[in-house]
């Protein structure tokens, strides 16, 4: 048996004897996770970052003005992975458990790779992590320099650093976020388009409101009427910008799969709610005031349509 296989076997044997505290069970309940997801991002929150088949734990160091990006500090529950540049939290770490943090490895990553919220680190310990300082009063210590065999256990550290580096490179692929003024202008243009479609094209209010959210998807004849009546192409594009209240909270995988499945099954369907949901996922942004309800309501419409 290889060394790694032997370690895994011992780990499984240990975990089989571990009794998970009731507080941890409650913290991982679907209801508690949903409650956390409804909160806006904030420094001190602990999350699981997932991208492709890899994952790691992080604590949010700061939230950017562009809500699609956050700065995070990597963490680990593996106490054997401590290094000289790490901090060891003997209490109050990930879900209150002993944990390692690497403040020097802080990176900007896309909000969308934050997958599962794991609660908060208290203010005192978070301040120590943010300032990369040990604090014996809070059981936060500097990582040891050598392991029992005289080697630096850096493999885990390097693996996490490489993973977060790959995540951080995705920030360069984000498109420029529409300004608040442009989004507000877009909402005003939507109202004008809606009024035009009702008065000049005989649409019902509900149809006109839906069409005004995606005017470029109107049929050729109606589109020409819009353009000849004084609307510019740029106006139509502005009308399709998401309003502030619909910047999405987070990419919920199960909902994303539903939307993608609906789009694949209905490739010719220009349903504005499908487009809206897809654009929301593309932005993967959290608004500071957390309009989760508005966004979730639009997604629910897509799900209802998909299942009926």
For each feature predicted by the language model, list its residue ranges.
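Compact nucleic-acid interaction/catalytic patches
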Residues: 48-92
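Loop/turn positions that initiate beta-strands
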Residues: 43-44, 103
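Alpha-helix N-cap/helix-start motif at helix boundaries, enriched for small hydrophobics
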Residues: 57-59, 208, 236
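C-terminal terminal-subdomain/extension
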Residues: 1-15, 31, 92-196, 202, ...
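Short amphipathic recognition helices of helix-turn-helix/homeodomain-type DNA-binding modules
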Residues: 212, 227-300
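Recognition helix of helix-turn-helix/homeodomain-like DNA-binding domains
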Residues: 198-229, 239-244
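Compositionally biased, charged N-terminal/linker segments
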Residues: 1-35, 40, 238-240
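Mid-protein regulatory/catalytic core that forms ligand/cofactor-binding pockets
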Residues: 301-306
